[in-house]
UniProtKB/Swiss-Prot annotation:
Organism: Arabidopsis thaliana
GN (gene name): AOX1B
Tissue expression notes: Expressed in flowers. Detected only in stamen.
UniProt similarity note: Belongs to the alternative oxidase family.
The name this protein goes by in its record: Ubiquinol oxidase 1b, mitochondrial
GO MF assignments: alternative oxidase activity; metal ion binding; superoxide-generating NADPH oxidase activity; ubiquinol:oxygen oxidoreductase activity
UniProt lineage: Eukaryota, Viridiplantae, Streptophyta, Embryophyta, Tracheophyta
Keyword Nucleotide-binding: no
């Protein structure tokens, strides 16, 4: 490097001297000439590169800002997956990504709400009194706050279908056999209960300690039900059947409070109107009616599943009631 600097300086000095000899009027100022060294050239190159990089970053950031609304499109197009453009029957845009129009339905409100399975065997009685024992602390904690009560109920009611569907799914894989449609039926139940929760979240805004209670209850109930289903599926399904009977009772009390004016009959959330295909002017009472009907259908499905096991058969031997609403 030192040789390069000296050689460059020597060339500059020789060039200036020759120009002075050819044209004497050109002043000889070799003593004031500063020769650019290699280090200076490097610094200049680095500054140029950084300036170019900064310019490119500004351009790219501007492009990102301009494409803020196209971020999702860029992501999905990168993977080759394009979102479907879905519209309602009237041509308006479908705004829900958590469910699609073909997953919506009109609930059957004519279902018998008073059906009850009388416990006769020891597992049935154990399941029945387990559910009854859980009702007492719930009544004590929520009392007549039925919106929050419904929210807590749905966080628990959405667990059995997922656990049962998961275990039946694993059994189907393990034994290389079909499930008779029960995987889908149980997962449908779990998804339906979750939609109940999403609906009541719009009605009852839970505070911090209710959210903490949900975390604790869900953690305990999930593991307890998982073990219970592994030990005795007929007991697990029977318990859910009784749990749904309690849910019917709870929503019936909810309706009484609405009819008596103790709870304001507010307009139905938009998500409920689209999910259950309710009228545009539907109210909270209409929502509670369809949710109660859903719980009655879940009651029937789980008591039916328990009866299959009581008869010494497996779920795959009886076609699952898929789409039973």
């Amino acid at each position: 490097m030192m040789m390069s600097r000296r050689y460059g300086a020597k060339l500059m000095e020789t060039a200036v001297t020759h120009s002075h000899l050819l044209n004497p009027r050109v002043p000889l100022v070799t003593e004031n000439i500063r020769v650019p060294a290699m280090g200076v050239v490097r610094v200049f190159s680095k500054m140029t590169f950084e300036k170019k990089k900064t310019t490119e970053e500004k351009g790219s950031s501007g492009g990102k800002a301009d494409q803020g609304n196209k971020g999702e499109q860029l992501i999905v197009s990168y993977w080759g997956v394009k979102p479907m453009k879905i519209t309602k029957e009237d041509g308006t845009e479908w705004k829900w990504s958590c469910f699609r129009p073909w997953e919506t339905y009109k609930s059957d409100l004519t279902i018998d709400l008073k059906k009850h399975h009388v416990p006769s065997t020891l597992p049935d009685k154990l399941a029945y009194w387990t559910v009854k024992s859980l009702r007492w602390p719930t009544d004590l904690f929520f009392q007549r706050r039925y919106g929050c009560r419904a929210m807590m109920l749905e966080t628990v009611a959405a667990v059995p279908g997922m656990v049962g569907g998961m275990l039946v799914h694993c059994k189907s894989l393990r034994r290389f056999e079909q499930s008779g449609g029960w995987i889908k039926a149980l997962l449908e139940e779990a998804e339906n209960e979750r939609m109940h929760l999403m609906t009541f979240m719009e009605v009852a805004k839970p505070n911090w300690y209710e959210r903490a209670l949900v975390i604790a209850v869900q953690g305990i109930f999930f593991n307890a039900y998982f073990l219970g289903y592994l030990i005795s599926p007929k007991f697990a399904h029977r318990m859910v059947g009784y749990l749904e009977e309690e849910a019917i009772h709870s929503y019936t009390e909810f309706l009484k409070e609405l009819d008596n004016g103790n709870i304001e009959n507010v307009p139905a959330p938009a998500i409920a109107i689209d999910y259950w295909r309710l009228e545009a002017d539907a109210t909270l009472r209409d929502v509670v009616m369809v949710v109660r009907a859903d719980e009655a259908h879940h009651r029937d499905v789980n008591h039916y599943a328990s009866d299959i096991h009581y008869q010494g058969r497996e779920l795959k031997e009886a076609p699952a009631p898929i789409g039973y609403h």
